[in-house]
Amino acid sequence: MIKDSEFYRLDGVPITKEEIRAISVEKLNICPEDIILDIGCGSGGMTVEISKRCKFVYAVDGSKDAIDTTLKNMDKFNVKNCEVYFGDAKDLISNFKVNKAFIGGTQNIESVIEKLNEKNVRNIVINTIVLENSVKVIQILERLNFSIEVISVLISYGKRISSGHMMLSKNPITIITAKK
């Protein structure tokens, strides 16, 4: 995994943290022939990591700043097997032929998941921060007859203080893996 500090960053554009990327990439079970859709690409952390393991990546985001940041990180890490698209994922999914998808964030999550299902995407990994979004995603996936695995991950980093080391936690992330 590439260290978070190595990525180009822009205030207001999120990046999936290194440890969460590691778990999410593993849950995608990427094969060299896979073509993967990264929805809500943000800073391009997952886009870059995924691209090193698969045939091709399509990255989508509704933020121009996110698109620009992803493109800068693709350039920095010499990613050539990826195309980046600005817009609403629900309107763009029909343009892509993919077999796996990662969702790091998006509007219209129900429509997005339904469209992925219609395109026979059989492995979807979805990261959520908001508890209600996790519940909503699980309900949608169950309705569509996906097999679901749900894990909650809390990453803490050690910080040296005068009396020893203190653990500082980041936001807990729910990682939902859906398969058919």
Curated annotation (Swiss-Prot):
InterPro entries: CbiT (IPR023475), Cbl_synth_MTase_CbiT (IPR014008), Cobalamin_biosynth_MTase (IPR050714), Methyltransf_25 (IPR041698), SAM-dependent_MTases_sf (IPR029063). S-adenosyl-L-methionine binds at residues 16, 40-44, 61, 89. The gene is cbiT. GO terms for molecular function: cobalt-precorrin-6B C5-methyltransferase activity; protein methyltransferase activity. Coiled coil: none annotated. CDD domains: AdoMet_MTases. Pfam families: Methyltransf_25. It catalyses: Co-precorrin-6B + S-adenosyl-L-methionine = Co-precorrin-7 + S-adenosyl-L-homocysteine + CO2. It comes from Methanococcus vannielii (strain ATCC 35089 / DSM 1224 / JCM 13029 / OCM 148 / SB). This is Probable cobalt-precorrin-6B C(15)-methyltransferase (decarboxylating). GO terms for biological process: anaerobic cobalamin biosynthetic process; methylation. It comes from the Archaea. Pathway: Cofactor biosynthesis; adenosylcobalamin biosynthesis; cob(II)yrinate a,c-diamide from sirohydrochlorin (anaerobic route): step 8/10. The keyword Ribonucleoprotein does not apply. Its EC number is 2.1.1.196. Belongs to the methyltransferase superfamily. Archaeal-type CbiT family. Keywords: Cobalamin biosynthesis, Methyltransferase, S-adenosyl-L-methionine, Transferase.
